[in-house]
Amino acid sequence: MATSARRAYGFGRADEATHPDSIRATLAEFLSTFVFVFAGEGSILALDKLYWDTAAHTGTNTPGGLVLVALAHALALFAAVSAAINVSGGHVNPAVTFAALIGGRISVIRAIYYWVAQLIGAILACLLLRLATNGLRPVGFHVASGVSELHGLLMEIILTFALVYVVYSTAIDPKRGSIGIIAPLAIGLIVGANILVGGPFDGASMNPARAFGPALVGWRWSNHWIYWVGPFIGGALAALIYEYMIIPSVNEPPHHSTHQPLAPEDY
């Protein structure tokens, strides 16, 4: 479904719920979220397995482990967004979808479809991980010892704000021009960098689906609300600021004629 530079708030067209484009986009979100969560959570389980087998018993709680987890997430998200961006816009994250909804770049119907697909993809990824690893329990996310829930919430807000800001500047902004080509790479890099910053404090989820899948399959619900509220607040703030303070009004005359129109992505 092609979009334009003009914001369009609404529930969605009557035929959107059954339109083939909606079904294809929803399937793309499901598959890409599955790929991302399987690789991201799988990297944590793999490191834990390696450290336990060598009697180190430290898992990802080392500088090297943190770097490897950040790299795995960055690479997996780069691949997942690249795979879906021409079909669904490559959200792969309920917070990104919420930001696009708040910014008038996606309909309510499409947002609901994406949320369901993202959550199911994350759950299935963790179920298959548990099966493939002979019952290893997904780790998920929790606030580190000595870090309060309020600090964890603030961390998630800031990290997700940065993520959605990069999404907007490279994949949504009508003025982005050729920089849109590197959108998947930029999105993967900011997630990897954010994990290096927030990982030791709250795990740096930035993605409610990424947190929900392991929480459900591993039945680990400690501090779980943070990983919904924080990303949704951070994503919404980034969307509102970028939409109304950075993207020019449709009535504002351009400075030059080389601005590119918004690509036909479903943001």
UniProtKB/Swiss-Prot annotation:
Gene name, Swiss-Prot/TrEMBL: TIP3-2
Record's keyword terms, sorted: Acetylation, Membrane, Repeat, Transmembrane, Transmembrane helix, Transport, Vacuole
InterPro entries: Aquaporin-like, Aquaporin_transptr, MIP, MIP_CS
Motif interval(s): NPA 1: 93-95
SUPFAM superfamilies in alphabetical order: Aquaporin-like (SSF81338)
Domain comment in the entry: Aquaporins contain two tandem repeats each containing three membrane-spanning domains and a pore-forming loop with the signature motif Asn-Pro-Ala (NPA).
Gene Ontology CC terms: vacuolar membrane
Cited Pfam families: MIP (PF00230)
Sequence motif NPA 2, location on chain: 207-209
The keyword Transport belongs to this UniProt entry's keyword annotation: yes
Name of the protein in question: Probable aquaporin TIP3-2
Residue intervals on the Vacuolar side: 48-66, 132-151, 200-226
Gene Ontology molecular function, alphabetical: channel activity
